[in-house]
A protein has these predicted regions:
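Interface amphipathic segments
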Residues: 1-218, 224-385
Length: 385
């Protein structure tokens, strides 16, 4: 048999190396035994895990094997922190010869159940069939209902069959289904999200940024053999980030593969019902290397103030909008940008200095990814540069 025992504090070569990578912990303990007679058994604990943006008090794992398979109990326990309430996340699972299941539970500091939902999987003759349970799972502290005959079947030939409908009484939920009546397409599946309240999900995603809004989305995938298509549409209504209202947003696009192994994408962004950006492009892979990209992106009254909530400590505040078209060509990792951008009433405010800068409305040329501010004026007050 195999026996592995590890006990580690915060001061050793491994801990010191992890500290250089921005990861530290208070104590690590592991005790695992494996033998032909008793199988795999053991436990592990990690205390005081810290990164730049994450602090977790306890992470644990317990594994026991018996005649029915391998049983696992794992989780994260975290006490109250500034701006973050305590929580307890538990993962309970079992892996047998022909089946497996995993159950997730989330409790807050008051032991209120924010999440209670599981997935079971059965090995079938030609694939794996999965099912969501129980019939009334809990999400965002509310009861949901999943259809009794729900399933997601992953076939050996790569096809997916699904019939999953998970919703609550308010219409919030998820649908994932395939069109089995389509005799032409090899694959025809759709995923839909409806009335997802971002503010509610902050209660079960501890380190999620302060966001509010309502999400609706739909993605459709069709594979008819020689041709395939992916289309998607994402809507965020009444969006707020860190308390700043950013309006209504819609992002959509269509992806099509070409006959010469090229990839075509057409996408758009709308803000408060008006299209503010459009992208159309082709990616051509190469037999060696990274391939080449050729795309055009057009801006029409793209508002710059939407970037303000994402600036750390509000060091700067932008206003105004931009118009124009840019072409992107070359290596997808570092394409060259060329084109022209028109700045419309663009201002740049630095609160700490109480300084306001107003940019000239003259078009700015972009040449090989460099903005050419030739004979370009920046005003601080009045009309004098």
């Amino acid at each position: 048999g195999l026996c592995l025992r590890i006990s580690s504090g915060p001061d050793n070569p491994i801990a010191n190396y992890l500290s250089m990578m921005g990861l530290s912990y208070t104590r690590l303990f592991m005790d695992v035994d494996s033998s032909p007679a008793e199988g795999l058994n053991g436990e592990a604990y990690l205390y005081g895990l810290r990164t730049d943006s994450l602090t977790l008090d306890t992470i644990y794992l317990d594994v026991q094997q018996d005649l029915n398979g391998i049983n696992m109990l794992s989780g994260v326990v975290n006490g109250p922190k500034p701006g973050q309430e305590a929580f307890d996340v538990t993962l309970e699972g079992n892996v047998g010869n022909n089946s497996a299941q995993l159950l997730v539970q989330y409790l807050n500091a008051r032991k209120e159940q924010g999440v209670y939902m599981g997935v079971m999987a059965d090995l079938r003759r030609h694939g794996i069939r999965m099912k969501v349970f129980p019939e009334h799972p809990t999400l965002v502290y509310r009861p949901f209902t999943v259809n009794k005959n729900n399933y997601i079947y992953l076939a050996d030939n790569g096809r997916i069959h699904a019939n999953l409908d998970l919703h609550d009484e308010q219409g919030t939920g998820l649908s994932f289904y395939t069109n089995r009546e389509d005799t032409i397409a090899k694959q025809d599946m759709t995923v839909e999200l409806s009335r997802i309240n971002l503010k509610e999900f902050r209660r079960i995603l501890p380190y999620m940024p302060d966001m509010e809004g309502w999400i609706g989305a739909e993605a459709h995938y069709i594979d008819s053999g020689p041709y395939m298509m992916v289309s998607s549409d994402l809507r965020i209504d009444e969006f707020k980030y860190e308390g700043s209202a950013l309006g209504n947003w819609e992002l959509g696009g269509v992806y099509l593969p070409g006959e010469a192994k090229d990839h075509h994408l057409d996408a758009y962004i709308r803000h408060d019902g008006e299209e503010i950006a459009h992208l159309g492009g082709i990616y051509l892979p190469a037999e060696e290397g990274t391939g080449s990209l050729s795309a055009d992106i057009a801006f029409e009254h793209f508002p710059l103030n939407v970037a303000n909530p994402f600036v750390p400590d509000r060091m700067v505040e932008l206003d105004g909008d931009i118009d124009g078209t840019l072409s992107m060509k070359g290596d997808p990792a570092k394409p060259l940008l060329n084109g022209e951008l028109a700045l419309d009433s663009v201002t740049f405010f630095m609160p700490e200095m109480s300084a306001m800068f107003r940019f000239d409305n003259e078009p700015v040329q972009v040449v090989n990814s460099k903005m050419m501010f030739k004979e370009f004026d920046i005003f601080t007050k009045g009309k004098t540069p």
